[in-house]
């Protein structure tokens, strides 16, 4: 029994570590590539299109050429009414989020991302997937106050960058709500590869119009450096992040992944001040962010409590570990790309770059059931 527990814990910590490294790495890498002070590729839409094109190409190879994953049954109606709107808001959230790197620091961006639960709750109420509640509203108010305090303490506050980031947050929140409303309504489940196969190309097309208007003229008149290996490794990291999130979802519970997400944010804030010396954190920044995080933690606690109350009694710890061990033994600890991912219920979590259907810190789902769900 002790061996089984240790094996499960070690694997869990390894997956969490991979997730934290990749998630932080993609954000810092994007900042480095886009920043005029470093690699100097100030074209966020172009960078996002490279990510989407690469992800779609890899997904196409895995599904159509190497037959690693079986394609899902996709009708024109589902594609037009579900995939297209989700892709539109996904593309918007990445576009606005990456553009924010040109104007504000990574540390301040992470602090603003604490608004994600507020944005998602508002969108969920507007779309009718959630109901206004006093306890949740008080937490949202606490988060908002914390972000305002943190913004007030920002030395290099930039209104343009802040607007871009907040707009991206609300676009991502609407994308999460649409994912729940549209895909769950159609009974469609997608694994990480099939989600990229359908959503990445569509997002690429949506980004083409603003790219043609805003960035193509700039590329024609200015000397933009293009290093193949830089962009290839950047896109590869973004793609790997998708799979790491999938592995973390399968190995950990909702509470664990939330704690990992909060830890990642603090690590990212600290790392960004070291890697990018121009990023300055004030006491007011930290105070405001701490207040906002208190609201986020309380909100997550309420959501987990609600889910536990609505679910049947969970298995005892020994039984659960035994089941996990049997599942691990059966799969020989190999990743099965045909496993589908249950679309999480919306709850307001910070998104990670390039994760079209899976949130980085799940709102309030339990353990995702892997292995026996057909893609």
From Swiss-Prot:
Transmembrane spans: 9-29, 43-63, 76-96, 106-126, 140-160, 163-183, 193-213, 229-249, 257-276, 280-302
GO CC terms, sorted: Golgi apparatus; membrane
Keywords, ordered alphabetically: Membrane, Sugar transport, Transmembrane, Transmembrane helix, Transport
Chief place of localization: membrane
Keyword Chloroplast: no
Region annotation Disordered: where it falls in the sequence: 328-348
Disulfide bonds: none
Membrane topology: Multi-pass membrane protein
Family per record: Belongs to the TPT transporter family. TPT (TC 2.A.7.9) subfamily.
Protein known as: Probable sugar phosphate/phosphate translocator At3g17430
């Amino acid at each position: 029994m002790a061996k089984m527990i240790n094996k499960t814990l070690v694997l869990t910590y390894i997956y969490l570590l991979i997730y934290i490294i990749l998630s932080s790495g993609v954000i810092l890498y994007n900042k480095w590539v886009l920043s005029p002070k470093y690699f100097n590729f100030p074209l966020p839409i172009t960078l996002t299109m490279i990510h989407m094109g690469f992800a779609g190409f890899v997904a196409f190879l895995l599904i159509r050429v190497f037959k690693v994953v079986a394609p899902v049954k996709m009708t024109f109606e589902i594609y037009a009414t579900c995939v297209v709107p989700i892709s539109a808001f996904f593309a918007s959230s990445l576009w606005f989020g990456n553009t924010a790197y040109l104007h504000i620091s990574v540390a301040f961006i992470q602090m603003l991302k604490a608004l994600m639960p507020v944005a998602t709750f508002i969108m969920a109420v507007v779309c009718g997937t959630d109901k206004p509640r006093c306890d949740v509203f008080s937490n949202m108010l606490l988060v908002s106050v914390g972000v305002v305090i943190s913004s007030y303490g920002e030395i290099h506050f930039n209104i343009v960058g802040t607007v871009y980031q907040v707009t991206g947050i609300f676009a991502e929140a609407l994308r999460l709500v649409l994912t729940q409303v549209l895909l769950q309504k159609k009974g469609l489940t997608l694994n990480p590869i099939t989600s990229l196969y359908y959503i990445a190309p569509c997002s690429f097309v949506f980004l083409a119009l603003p790219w043609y208007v805003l960035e193509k003229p700039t590329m024609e008149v200015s000397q933009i450096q293009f290093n193949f290996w830089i962009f290839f490794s950047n896109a590869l990291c973004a793609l790997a992040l998708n799979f790491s999130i999938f592995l973390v979802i399968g190995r950990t519970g909702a509470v664990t992944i939330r704690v990992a997400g909060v830890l990642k944010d603090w690590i990212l804030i600290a790392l960004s001040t070291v890697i990018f010396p121009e990023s300055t954190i004030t006491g007011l920044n930290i105070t405001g962010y701490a207040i906002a995080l208190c609201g986020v933690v309380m909100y997550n606690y309420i959501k987990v409590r609600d889910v536990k109350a609505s679910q049947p009694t969970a298995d005892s710890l020994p039984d659960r570990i035994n089941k996990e061990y049997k599942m691990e033994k059966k799969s020989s600890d190999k990743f099965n790309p045909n496993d589908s991912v249950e679309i999480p219920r919306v709850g307001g979590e910070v998104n990670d770059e390039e994760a079209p259907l899976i949130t980085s810190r799940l709102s309030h789902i339990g353990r995702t059931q892997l292995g026996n769900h057909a893609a």
